[in-house]
């Protein structure tokens, strides 16, 4: 999910 990329 896009939020996973933001977490990184």
Swiss-Prot record:
Spell out the coiled coil positions from the record.
none
Q: Which domain of life is it from?
A: Eukaryota
The UniProt entry's GO biological process terms, in alphabetical order, are: killing of cells of another organism
* Tissues where this protein is expressed: Expressed by the venom gland.
S-S bonds: none
- What keywords is this UniProt entry annotated with? Cytolysis, Secreted
Protein task: Causes weak hemolysis, mild mast cell degranulation, and small LDH release. Therefore, this peptide may be considered a weak cytolytic agent acting on mast cells, through two different mechanisms of interaction with the cells. The interaction with mast cells occurs through two different mechanisms: firstly, the peptide may bind to a G-protein coupled receptor (GPCR) related to the control of mast cell exocytosis, and secondly, it may cause a minor structural disorganization of the mast cell membrane. Does not have antimicrobial activity.
Q: In its UniProt entry, what is this protein called?
A: Cryptide TyPep-9
Q: What is the lineage of its organism?
A: Eukaryota, Metazoa, Ecdysozoa, Arthropoda, Chelicerata
